[in-house]
Each structure stands twice: as C-alpha cells, then as structure tokens.
C-alpha cells in the first residue's frame, strides 16, 4: 500500500491541529464550573459527561495526520488515568500548553532536542517540589474532600467513599455498581464471601431466610469430589464428639455422601452443610488455600499425600460464624493466624504487580479483599439511565482519586499545586539557551490548568493567576464561589499522585511530539466505484463487437 509522508513544519502543523481539536473538546470540562460534553452514540440516547478521558476516547479525526496528533494526546489522558485514576483533563491541558509554546520555539529555529532536555529537567524539579508540598491524607475528612472534588463537588459521594474506607480499610476493595433507586447507598460485606451456595436446600436451618447459619463451626476443605460417605465417616465421628456443626467445602459432594449428610441433618443429628468450592482449575486451588489460611485449617489434597480417611480434627478450620445462602457463602472472623494471613496478602499483592492481564489483576484483588475482611459496594442512584452512567463515571473517578491521595498525600487543588511548584524552577538553568527556553515553556504551561479552571468559571484568568502567584502556601482561588483563600481549609484538595502523573505524562508525550520531524500514514484509497470497472466494461463491448 502506498504511503503518504509529511516532513518538518507541514507535519508538525497538521499534528498540532489534531491536538487542538481534542484538547479543546476535553478542557471545557475542567474545574467545578466545567461544562458538559454531549457524545452521540450509535444506539440509545446521547451520553452527557464531564469526564475528560471519556471525551478523549470518542474523538477520531478524518485527516490521518491530524488524527495522529489527537491520538498521541489521548494517550496522555489514558496513561494518567491508568496510573492515578484521575487528572486526565489536567494532563491534556498541560500537554496542549507545552506543545503550543514548544511549536513556536521550534518554528523560531531552536533545537527541539535541547527544548525537550530543558522540559525534562524542569519536570524533574517540579515533581520533587510537588512531593515536598504534599501532606498525608490520613483522616476521613481529607479523604471525603478529595472524593468530593473529583466527583465534581458532590459531597455525598466523597462522604460515601470515606465511610467505605473506614469500614474496609484504605487498601480494602471498594466497588461501584448501578443501584436500583434514586439515592446513593453503601453496602459492606464483612468477612470472606464467595459466590457458591449450599448444594442442597435441605441444609438450610433458617426457613424464613432459607440460609444455613452456624456459630463456631468446623470447616473441612477438600480439593476433590466426595461421593462415598465412608471416606468422611471417621472425621464426622470426631466432629460429633465436639458437638459442633461442620461446613464442608469441596469440589462437589454427590450421590451417597450427599444423601447421608442431608438425612442426618433432617433427623437432627450432626449439623452439616456442603458447599462447592469457588473458582475453577488453579484459581479454585488458590482460593481453597486462601480459606484454609483464613480459618486456620488445611486443604485435604491427595496431590500432597493426604486422604480424607486419615484426616483429623486438627486439620479443620474454624470461624466465629458462617452463613450459607442459595448462591453465596460468608465466613466471618476466621481463626487463622494473623501473620499467615498478612503473608498471604503480601504474596497475592506481588502477583498483582507482576500480572499483565487486567482480568487476572481484578480476580487477585478480589482475593486480597476477601482475606482482608470485607468488600464495600457503593450503589449509585439516579433518575435516568443517562444520568446513572454519568454519575457512575464520576464515582469511579472519585474512588481512584481518594486511593491516589492515600498513597502519596494531598496538595492544594484548583491548579494551585502546579503554580506553587514553579518555585522550584525559579533558579533552574539549562546547559544552553535552548534548554533554558524548554524550562520557560514548562513554566508557562504549569499555569495552564489554573487558567482553564478560571476561564470555565467565566472569570478573568490573568487577574486570578497573578493574584495566586503573589500569594504563598495553600493560598488559591475557589472557582466554585469566586473566593480567594486557603485551599486546604476550603476543602479543595488534589492527590499529589494525580498532579505528578499529569505533569510527567503530558511532558513526556509533548516532548516526543516536539522532536517529530516526519509523519507516515497510508494513502487514502480511491472511493470512485467505477474506477475498476472501465476496463472490464470495454472488454465486454469488444467481445460483443466481434460477434456481430
């Protein structure tokens, strides 16, 4: 296929046109008074969003050179979203600002490589300064404030996230789901829950809720099918002497073994309940091992030379309470050793870091949550499906932002942190004049998020930026109310990780684009439907002429 190649100024101009189209669509969403963007969908109602990355993902341009520019800036938003979960619009605004200033310098004859070196030098100094001005986000109030800001000033969402973190821990698993009502709500599942219920409804001992509930039961874990009752009779007799109920978690319990356990249950003998083990294949073995560590038991596995006939009561796990329903099982307060549980969690966390599959990561995180003792579910409520999707996006953003805040602390929000980080660039010098120009490019670009927030609020950007620069510390501008003051006291916080990631990714991609000298794309195919038919048609005519 033939290629279309553009060089130098022509290539950079078309690339910059694409950058501007995408960035101009994304940046209107920035800040508390950011505007909405309406996105047409091929099916259903149009989507309305204030989420920068959602807008960026929708943009595809007809001109291939312009589209390359747009897609490179989209990469800035996506990378920032992947690392910090928020800050996509800030990253896009920064990338555009660096490119606009940088392209002017390149057009004026400066060395693009030196400009990039100057920008990189300035970014390193600014990131260090962001780290220095950050404060830890330890308390619920700070977490709620970060969540509220990221959810476009929705305080209810911030409070729900803070409450969820209180209940399941800052590293606990919090998921976001679409609710059925108009109100947002929080549900917390304590203990380890997995999606397998009783094998037979005859195991249920609470007829009103159709659940089997046991206090201080023994828990037998087996990684094979149990079909012969004689295999487990010795163990059942030992448990019966202790007068405690027994929960059996196995690959399956069937035939004679299941029938005997059910009949025994109904006659009021040994209280038992059989449940299929969660997961499949290797994941099932791993989850059985998780349950064993949580309950202080041992998985009876023939692979390591164990057998059910010789199993003893010491190999059984125990828990304070077990509730088994039709579709799930909850084990609360397992008797496992705390150090063993922490070591297991640490081991799974290492697997998460090494994994390249999003699906595997999600499943591993679920296992961490179950071992850590709880999962919080935020159920989002709204009046319409369109509003529900928009709100769910905002809650997801807020959740990621609060996690980022817990990791690296918080900085004053509203673009103030980047303005304060300019202090680190005041005396910074490059190796030559072109590098100094690169440092100056970043100086101007770091004001861009604050300028855009103010512009979206309908105020005069230059006036506000000068006022904020003349202040110090957390002094900034609350665009929602039009008031100057201490951003931390006003509850306007950004996670330091978000500001850092936005700056690093924007500068990285912008630097690569500034040093671009050629662009290659496929030549457009001819769309004339008759183009390939002329010769064939004429040949046919010739044939007919010969016949006459």
UniProtKB/Swiss-Prot annotation:
Binding partners and assembly: Forms a cylinder of 14 subunits composed of two heptameric rings stacked back-to-back. Interacts with the co-chaperonin GroES.
Pfam families the record matches: Cpn60_TCP1
GO CC terms: cytoplasm
Keyword entries, A-Z: ATP-binding, Chaperone, Cytoplasm, Isomerase, Nucleotide-binding
SUPFAM superfamilies per the UniProt record, alphabetical: GroEL apical domain-like, GroEL equatorial domain-like, GroEL-intermediate domain like
Binding sites annotated in the UniProt record for ATP: 29-32, 50, 86-90, 414, 478-480, 494
Compartment annotation: Cytoplasm
Catalysed reaction equations from the record: ATP + H2O + a folded polypeptide = ADP + phosphate + an unfolded polypeptide
Gene that produces this protein: groEL
Protein name in UniProt: Chaperonin GroEL
The protein's Enzyme Commission number: 5.6.1.7
Function: Together with its co-chaperonin GroES, plays an essential role in assisting protein folding. The GroEL-GroES system forms a nano-cage that allows encapsulation of the non-native substrate proteins and provides a physical environment optimized to promote and accelerate protein folding.
Family that this chain belongs to: Belongs to the chaperonin (HSP60) family.
CDD domains: GroEL (cd03344)
GO biological process, one term: protein refolding
An annotated Gene Ontology molecular function: ATP binding
């Amino acid at each position: 296929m033939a290629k279309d190649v553009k060089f130098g100024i022509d290539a950079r101009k078309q690339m910059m046109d694409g950058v501007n189209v995408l960035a101009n669509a994304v940046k209107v969403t920035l800040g508390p008074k950011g505007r909405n963007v309406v996105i047409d969908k091929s099916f259903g109602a149009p989507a309305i969003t204030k989420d920068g990355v959602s807008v960026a993902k929708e943009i595809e341009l007809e001109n291939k050179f312009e589209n390359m520019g747009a897609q490179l800036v989209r990469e800035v938003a996506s990378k920032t979203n992947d690392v910090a979960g928020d800050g996509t619009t800030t990253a896009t605004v920064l990338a555009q600002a660096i490119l606009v200033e940088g392209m002017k310098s390149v057009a004026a004859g400066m060395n693009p490589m030196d400009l990039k070196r100057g920008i990189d030098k300035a970014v390193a100094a600014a990131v260090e300064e962001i780290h220095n001005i950050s404060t830890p986000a330890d308390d619920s109030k700070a977490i709620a404030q970060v969540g509220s800001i990221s959810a476009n000033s929705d305080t209810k969402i911030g409070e729900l996230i803070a409450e969820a973190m209180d209940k399941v821990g800052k590293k606990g698993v919090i998921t976001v789901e679409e609710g059925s009502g108009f109100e947002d709500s929080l549900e917390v599942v304590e203990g380890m829950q997995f999606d397998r219920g009783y094998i037979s409804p005859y195991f249920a001992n609470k007829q009103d809720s159709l659940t089997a509930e046991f206090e201080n039961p023994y828990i037998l874990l087996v990684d094979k099918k149990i079909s012969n009752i004689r295999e487990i009779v010795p163990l059942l007799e030992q448990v019966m002497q202790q007068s405690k109920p027994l929960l059996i978690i196995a690959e399956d319990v069937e035939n004679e073994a299941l029938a005997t356990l059910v009949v025994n249950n109904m006659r009021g003998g040994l209280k038992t309940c059989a449940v299929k083990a969660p997961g499949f294949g290797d994941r099932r073995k791993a989850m059985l091992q998780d349950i064993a560590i949580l309950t202080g038991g041992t998985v009876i596995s023939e692979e390591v030379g164990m057998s059910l006939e010789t199993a003893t009561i010491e190999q059984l796990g125990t828990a304070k309470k077990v509730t088994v329903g039709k579709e799930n099982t909850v084990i609360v307060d397992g008797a496992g050793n705390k150090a063993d549980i922490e070591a297991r969690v640490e081991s799974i966390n290492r697997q998460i870091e090494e994994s390249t599959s999003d699906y595997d990561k999600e499943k591993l995180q679920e296992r961490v949550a179950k071992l850590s003792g709880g999962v919080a579910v935020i159920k989002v409520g709204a009046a319409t499906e369109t509003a529900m999707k928009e709100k769910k996006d905002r809650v997801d953003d807020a959740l990621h932002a609060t996690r980022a805040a817990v990791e690296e602390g918080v900085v004053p929000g509203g673009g103030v942190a980047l303005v304060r980080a300019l202090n680190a660039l005041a005396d910074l010098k490059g190796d030559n004049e072109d590098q100094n120009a690169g440092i100056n490019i970043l100086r101007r670009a770091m004001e861009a998020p604050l300028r855009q927030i103010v512009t979206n609020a309908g105020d005069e950007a230059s006036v506000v930026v000068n006022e904020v620069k003349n202040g110090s510390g957390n002094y900034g501008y609350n665009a929602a109310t039009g008031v100057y003051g201490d951003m931390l006291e006003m509850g306007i916080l950004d996670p330091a990780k978000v500001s850092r990631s936005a700056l690093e990714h924007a500068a990285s991609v912008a630097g690569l684009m500034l040093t671009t000298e050629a662009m290659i794309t496929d030549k457009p195919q001819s769309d004339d439907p008759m183009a390939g038919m002329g010769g064939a048609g004429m040949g046919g005519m010739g044939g007919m002429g010969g016949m006459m």
